[in-house]
């Protein structure tokens, strides 16, 4: 039986088993390099499965696939959260990527010319580490939330699943990003709904048509691949702003 306190040595540790971590794993395996992916979830794709019931990707499935394996189904369809989760699980299985689930990394440190990764009683030593963890995993709740009347139901998007969790009456959605807008549209079908957040701008044409989606996706892809990259000053500036 393995000693959980024994230091395990491996060439490369990848922290995070989502899209980024699995993609890195695919490239490492393709080159025959030894590695191990550590993921805090009990099952690959659980970060998606835990989101609200109606969640869909807002990019077509043709752009949701990872290297070496297309996303199944129609290329212009918008996958559900569970379809995305199952795809990631199938991806790891197909390429036999070494993923160790249920391992939450607590600390990453440098000792000499190596890195030490600590996860509870487990310790791993690696020549290099790829940090592929997702941002925004911890809910952020405004400080004034505790001062609101206790009769007001408060839910963070992290805990929201469907409108059945809400009591009758109006709903205020705080935050006008993708999650806030998506939830507000769903809630508004059965409740008076308001949104509070920064001005997000407006696309100057209707995006629900096939032609609009065709050009919009390609425009976003062009900016993502050629403009907003670390090779361009504007990309580096935006990256610094997001990280800080």
Name each region found by the language model.
Residues 5-37, 173, 179-188:
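N-terminal Rossmann-like FAD-binding beta1-loop-alpha1 element of flavoenzymes
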Residues 9-11, 102, 168:
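Phosphate-coordination loops involved in phosphoryl transfer and adenosine-cofactor binding
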Residues 13-15, 26-53, 190-205:
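Glycine-rich FAD pyrophosphate-binding loop
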Residues 42-70, 204-218:
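Conserved N-terminal glycine-rich FAD pyrophosphate-binding loop of Rossmann-like flavoproteins
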Residues 62-89, 94, 229-244:
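Conserved N-terminal/central alpha/beta ligand/cofactor-binding core
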Residues 74, 80-83, 133-193:
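Glycine-rich dinucleotide-binding loop and its adjacent helix/turn
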Residues 77-137:
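Feature captures the FAD/FMN-dependent oxidoreductase FAD-binding
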Residues 180-244:
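Dinucleotide-binding/catalytic capping subdomain of oxidoreductase cores
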């Amino acid at each position: 039986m393995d000693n959980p306190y024994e230091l395990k040595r491996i060439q490369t540790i990848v922290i995070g088993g989502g899209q980024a971590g699995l993609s890195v794993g695919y490239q490492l395996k393709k080159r025959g390099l030894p590695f191990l992916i550590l993921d805090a979830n009990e099952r690959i794709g659980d970060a998606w499965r835990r989101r609200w019931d109606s969640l869909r990707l807002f990019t077509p499935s043709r752009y949701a696939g990872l290297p070496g394996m297309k996303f199944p189904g129609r290329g212009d369809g918008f996958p559900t959260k569970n379809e995305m989760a199952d795809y990631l699980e199938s991806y790891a299985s197909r390429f036999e990527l070494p993923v160790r689930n249920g391992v939450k990394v607590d600390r990453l440190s440098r000792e000499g010319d190596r890195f030490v990764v600590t996860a509870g009683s487990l310790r791993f030593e690696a020549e290099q580490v790829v940090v592929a963890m997702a941002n925004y995993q911890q809910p952020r709740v405004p400080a004034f939330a505790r001062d609101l009347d206790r009769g007001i139901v408060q839910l963070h998007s992290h805990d929201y699943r469907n409108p059945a969790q809400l009591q009758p009456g109006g709903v205020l959605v705080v935050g006008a990003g993708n999650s806030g807008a998506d939830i507000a549209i769903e809630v508004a079908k059965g409740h008076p709904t308001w949104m509070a957040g920064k001005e997000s701008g407006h696309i100057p044409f209707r995006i629900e048509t096939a032609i609009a989606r065709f050009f919009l996706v390609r425009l976003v892809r062009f900016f993502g691949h050629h403009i907003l990259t670390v090779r361009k000053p504007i990309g580096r500036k935006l990256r610094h702003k997001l990280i800080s």
